[in-house]
Amino acid sequence: MSGGDVEEYLRGADMPEEYRRYYSSLSGGTYDIFEKAASAKSNLADSSGMVEPKIAVDLSDRVAKMHDLDIAGPLRELLATKGKELAALMLAKEIMDGKYLPEADIEKRIDSAVRVGLAVVTEGVTIAPLQGIADVITKKNKDGSEYLSVSIAGPMRSAGGTESAVTMLIADYVRRQAGLAEYQADSLDDETGRFIEELRIYEREVGSFQFHVLDEDIRAVISHLPVELDGVDTDPYEVVNHKGMSRIQTDRVRGGALRVLNDGLIGRSKKLLKRIELYGLDGWEWLAELKGAVQTGENKEDAAAKRMREVITGRSVLSMPNRLGGFRLRYGRACNTGYTSVGFHPAVAEILDHTIAVGTQVKIDIPGKGATVAFVDTIEAPTVRLAGGDVVKIRDVAHGIELKGSIERILHLGDMLISFGDFLENNAQLVPSGYVEEIWKMDMEAAGAAQGSPSSADEAVRISRELGVPLHPRYLYYWDQISHEELAMLLSPLDKGDAISYPAACKPVLEKLGVPHKAGPEGPVLEGDEARIFRELILDNPPGPDASAPVPELISRSSGITIRDKFSTSIGVRIGRPEKAAPRQMRPPTHCLFPVGGTGGPTNNLLKSAARPGFSADILSRRCPGCGEPSISIRCWACGERTAVERTCMQCGTDVDGEECERCGRPGLAHSRVEFPLKKMLVSAQEKTGVRAHDPLKGVKELAHQDRIAEPLEKGLIRQSRSLTVFKDGTVRFDATNSPMTHFKPSWIGTSAEKLRELGYETDVDGKKLEGPDQLVELRMQDIVIPLEGAKYLVSACGYIDAELDKLYGAPPFYKVPDLGGLIGHLVVGLAPHTSVGVAARIIGYTETHVCFGTPNWHSAKRRDADGDADSIILLMDALLNFSRHYLSDRIGGLMDAPLLIQPLVLPHESQSQAHNIEVVKRLPPGFYEAAAARKKASEVGCVEIVKSRLETAGQFGGYHFTHGTSSLTTSRPRSAYSTLGSMLDKLDLQIRNANLIAAVDAAEIISNVISTHLVPDIMGNLRAYARQNFRCTACGKSYRRIPLAQRCSCGNGLIQTITRASVEKYLKLAKRLVNEYDVGAYQRGRIHALSDEIELVFGKGGGDQALLTDF
């Protein structure tokens, strides 16, 4: 689509007028920047002379431009009438029939048909269709019949398990249309046995798959597949018993093909059956007979418990599954949760020394596997025991900070807010909800009352008695979690006066209940509201003994006040990855993509290389016909004339005028190692930019692209002057953890209401004019709020772009951003590492967090959720001006994490289903809680409005609601302790301190898990690596598998070990300390001592253990 086509499309679309203007502004801004970048590059100051990323508006546009086929219009029509799945097949058939490639042979048409079909299914976002499929070719069976073979490469992983398996379905459909025979497995060799051996080698030597599958399933799949599943080798491990097979070109493991087999065809077999029915394919009925994915013999609950046991040193366990005192499940969504982001009360972070922060990844047991942290202060806060024995319910963050230093035990962590949409996405079973304020309000409405929450216990009791509604949750304790014997203990207080006192033996029961109380001289003392509630519930009319009835029912009968269960389930939570907000850098960090070979030292220093006489580089052979100087750019750096690429025949060595040698027919080689005037070019670049190079100016060792195309040195100089580094594709990037946001307040993002009105935010969610900092506003589809650190980095990047436009391209500056405020309103692109499409976004503010806030639809357009991953943010002008495919590797996977396409608009109906499953209601209806009480699957609940129900209407763009409010996004610190603490010992100390502090965590069990899942495997792995280590040159960095006889590098310098005794033993002293201090069992203790003995056998007796700082 052109800019005019986009405007026409927007005029005809069903959307609110403000969104029409919004989208028009985004697309207009994108095309305007594209034109400016194209104008700048037309002066030929770099190696491409043109803007390389293509603008693709929708799915059809992306697929067409990814494959350079004129299919956008037909595909758009097919999508409108047939849907994505059937459109993929129908378009594949048309391509195979030659409608769009009339001059191509049958193999080329089949290849394109399969790739384009997969591109449609994967929404034209991932690189899987281009590089995940290595080849689609025809081969011959033993009987001479032709069949279809699909060769899979590593990048197929980016498509996802189901979509990667759908590749085989599309290939089978195309095979039938082409009239090819079925693949006959094992007709020449034992191909099923090869796959079984290969898959087990991969699991043992390379890594695990998402699922574990049975040998019999592998045998069934390979023997029944109508299309051959082949692949390119991805890892250096070879099969032993199935080498030299006639139809398999490699003896090494084929990771891409194995993943399609394991995680796709077998692991997603049930999902594939639905696709097969939709496609109308026969011959795949055998999929129904597979056992499918198994969790190594465990049921779902065991698998979740196993995830909780996989504890990493320094990453705390906050709550163990189904432990009273752990995080109680609370259903609902805040404006900053959902889409796999879960809500915690911010006081939890404060009292746990900021073990968690916004964006910290947590591993959970329901409804999915991972999530990120968000803070919501309208859910239940923790209940704690202080050093003096008092039990206190924390009121708010300030109260938590005040109490932090005197907390002895966290008795109850409070609530964890989880979206219904997360349960729906995982099709998880709902669990009954505890009695919470939302249900109480519905009970009040059912009773015909509209009163707000009670302000005191007296009022709560009165409401319950007069209206017959259950006691308000604020005055409800965990009665459902105590025994009849414990209840009997509470019926006999020492004093029933204004303050109720109990003997010391009752204190554990009161703590279990979560009742705030004072520590008196004889035992716990209840005062105020707590004393009033106890008198009303159990003391004035004591419940009689009845072991057959639950405790809440006994109390309800005797008191006349209905008591509901406060506890539902507690969720297992452990820390995963810390939040991330940092510049994206190459390793080592690089200023300029210019090769120095081995002359630049460990930092690839261009200045060091330039000082060497006769410097040469393996670089594109581009030379000026006028002055004869070698050049990087199309226009000569010395005289300004247009340069030409010199090609040489690889076979006969003659100069080649075109792409191929006329004599040999071989392609001409465009690069060679030539003497290069690096020093003169650096001097010229410094004069041109007015920037002086500082030591070290970092280049790269070698260039990745087959033509060895380098960047102009001017870019590296300007980047260095602004403390920026370059990524492998020529762009400057900042990475930040993904986090969802649907609404915000101006005060949260540091942007004034006046500035927001300029950006189109005229009103708040209530339709009132936006004037104040605390009005709630709905976030637009492609507006983002970025980390403050990222904003500062991008301001520097703006200065770099402007200097580059001025000094290198001779164009006027574009950004002219003097400070952070000037960045507001500018366009960027978001890019996930496994994709090749940058999604446009507009910056509207900053937060002191380490996350990038955006709508679920925007994150979904990048094929991401908020489970802890980080994506890149790139200035749109940077992506258009500086990105080049010619900097990227030609190897398989080289095009991943590159903005080949720019998507200016995010259309909700094109988002992934996960974004469509988000609830958009002000409250969850009674029917939902009834379904939860019945433990129904989330997919069986139809009474909750989700985004999916609004698709193809104006309501899909906005008017979303949420169930729980919050007054702020963050806490007093923007980063988690894991990110800020220095040593692993400090992190472990915090982990142990948290385990001892939280009642829902068993410290000894955590230590045992740390030893078994982290320390022991790490020590064993390091010991194994020591035996296999390489040796490295201290000067040039060259690596040797074995030490040469001369015991020196080829450059003459010495060699050193890459793994030392210290690195093998780094956790041994720590492990010894842990097994001695904690009751981890004889087995764990024996393992550590056995490892210690083994290390001494390898290295000899040490000179004594190195003391730890914590030993003093």
UniProtKB/Swiss-Prot annotation:
Keyword annotations of the record: DNA replication, DNA-binding, DNA-directed DNA polymerase, Exonuclease, Hydrolase, Multifunctional enzyme, Nuclease, Nucleotidyltransferase, Transferase
Cross-referenced InterPro entries: PolC_DP2, PolC_DP2_cat_dom, PolC_DP2_central_dom, PolC_DP2_N
Domain of life: Archaea
E.C. code: 2.7.7.7, 3.1.11.1
Record bears the keyword Transferase: yes
Subunit details: Heterodimer of a large subunit and a small subunit.
Free-text function comment from the UniProt entry: Possesses two activities: a DNA synthesis (polymerase) and an exonucleolytic activity that degrades single-stranded DNA in the 3'- to 5'-direction. Has a template-primer preference which is characteristic of a replicative DNA polymerase.
UniProt-listed PANTHER family: DNA POLYMERASE II LARGE SUBUNIT (PTHR42210:SF1)
Record HAMAP family: DNApol_II_L_arch (MF_00324)
Protein name: DNA polymerase II large subunit
Species of origin: Cenarchaeum symbiosum (strain A)
Gene symbol of the encoding locus: polC
